């Protein structure tokens, strides 16, 4: 049984010091979405043998006062804070059976800002796709759209539709209907990562390989080729589509050899898929333990994820999505030794 401790609300300016969360941070708001994120985060903390920090954030709303004074009225801070503390206590109770160290905090401030600041020291941020509404409920929803693009650490968005695979239930009739429509999907022990030839995608592949090793899973590297491939800058037009697929597969095979040099015991598969990046990713999420992408790229998976199609990936995925921020990795230096690089001129 891990140690459990309720922390006082620290001053925001002290968040960057040594007391800031160092392990996995999960945002909760009392909603079913937040509960799913919490369960996923607790399991991940157990896999990594890292502490879990549970956080909820609230802000005190200000309303225009009625009457002739033209003033403003505020809601009692203590009332809202008590509700937030109850949410935290419920979350602490829910993960009490995991063999992890857990602490928690209630933060007074904008949820996006709180979590973004925590990303400076956290290993991983985890949250649901939307919240329950209300003041504390603002933690999720818009946060799940904003954070992946700006967080300093990797983020995982956990959609409510995968509650059944986490052993959770929901009263959301829309989600239950969607789960019934999808049917029981057997989850494969596989981590899927989308690549598009960018260096950022290769960084995402390395993070995906780390995740696959932790899960004891196969890593599946996928490149999507849309029908109108002229939208992909490095694809010539007109083209021999069959030849294009063969060239991309050869490049993926070279990338596989590179990965195996760094992860000799990892099972790695590679595949070229016909279709749009969003469609391919959503389809893969139905069966994968996790799908992984970078924050930006050439216009395929990563380039589209946090641009105009973010709703099509993060909001329609059927499983958890890990987004990897841009960063340097010394293992990228030897990639060229293993053959042609996807997307290279």
Q: What function would you assign to each model-found segment?
A:
Residues 2-20, 33, 93-125, 164-167, ...:
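Structural beta-alpha unit
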Residues 2-73, 182-238, 267, 344-345:
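Small/aliphatic-rich secondary-structure junction motif
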Residues 53-55, 103-107, 156, 220-222, ...:
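General small-molecule cofactor/ligand-binding pocket signal
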Residues 72-86, 239-250:
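A short acidic, glycine-rich active-site loop
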Residues 127-150, 164-168, 290-316, 330:
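Glycine-rich, Arg-bearing micro-motifs that act as flexible, cationic patches
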Residues 128-129, 155-160, 322-325:
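Short beta-strand elements of ligand-binding domains
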Residues 164-188:
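Short, flexible helix-coil linker/hinge segments at the edges of structured domains or between repeats
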Residues 202, 213, 221, 231, ...:
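Conserved N-terminal glycine/acidic-rich loop preference
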